[in-house]
Amino acid sequence: MTKFLFTSAIVLLLGCQSFQKTPDISAIDVPLTTIRFEQAFFAIDTLQLDPSLQKLAGQEHFFTQDFLYNILATTPQTAAKDVPQFMRAYQSMYKQVSTQFASLKTEEAAIKEGLQYVKYYFPDYKLPTKLITFIGPINSFGNIITIDALAVGLQMYLGKNDPIYLTEEGQNLYPVYVSRRFERAYMATNCMKNIIDDLYPLQDAGAPLCEQMVEAGKRLYFLKKVLPHEADSIVTGYTAAQLEGCYKSEKDIWSFFVQNNLLYEKDPSLIGDYMHDGPNTAVFGDSSPGFIGQFVGYRIVEAFLEKNKETSLDKLLKIPAKIIFEQAKYKP
């Protein structure tokens, strides 16, 4: 059974990738206004709830509706009870967020740079013009793309060791392999994931494993192109050690899929472990990452691009995964 191995040589290999030439985006203007919705929301007068919510909606109509009815999951009939109840329950978190996220300059800069690269590669795409921060229920949405905004739930970025994630309820919702990524360093990556989902909604349900892996690889390639300065461990979601292990064991990982006739398998019960997040991929050992199909798919995409160097990012995302897989002739 394959086990992951680690060598310092992999660190050097990954480090070299950051020196790839990136396009000059300095002249690309991307308007992005940050709106601290949580500040306006927690300032409302619950004794005058209806006019306060109407005023809030006047300031940010579309997101106020999204927040109340999708994130808080309240209704016009129950808002008078639900909103004050939520505000009381999350008042201490709001105070924490006010201190912890007093400034978002680093995150704003990374997100804006990502949008500049998106505009470079996809000039006709209508970019979000707002970055909206909010505090929502811990069991609700953390990252959203709306009609004109990227919305970020700061309750999902308090830091991996925040007590709220380590409670029994928190771990039931978000096991450690998930909550370890609840760091502000992941904010730009999560925003760009929403962009790719908007540009090219994933439609690989029922596809064989090889095609699902390629689709995941295409999306990871997109992230690396629009976030060229982010660490590989951030954009992949793997730990640095897991990523090292993937490169070191790349040949063994591929051999496993080939020898077990899994590449054209469609049964979710047989291939789900390779395409879903998890603490690890059991067959490869405790040191391996979950969602290991993303890594394999990314390497297949790289093999394809080695043979098709003039392929634009837009064109790559439009090419059927089946064609990429067949033409890549990937063999580590």
Task: List the predicted regions and their residue ranges.
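Positively charged n-region of N-terminal signal peptides that target proteins for export
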Residues: 1-4
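C-terminal motif of bacterial Sec signal peptides marking the signal peptidase cleavage site
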Residues: 13-15
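N-terminal mature-domain "stem" immediately C-terminal to a signal peptide or N-terminal signal-anchor/transmembrane
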Residues: 17-89
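Sec-exported extracytoplasmic/periplasmic mature domains
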Residues: 42, 119-123, 223-231, 258-262, ...
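Acidic/His-rich structured neighborhood in mature extracellular/periplasmic domains
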Residues: 83-243, 321
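Acidic/His/Gly-enriched intrinsically disordered linker/tail segments
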Residues: 217-281
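C-terminal soluble interaction/assembly domains
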Residues: 264-332
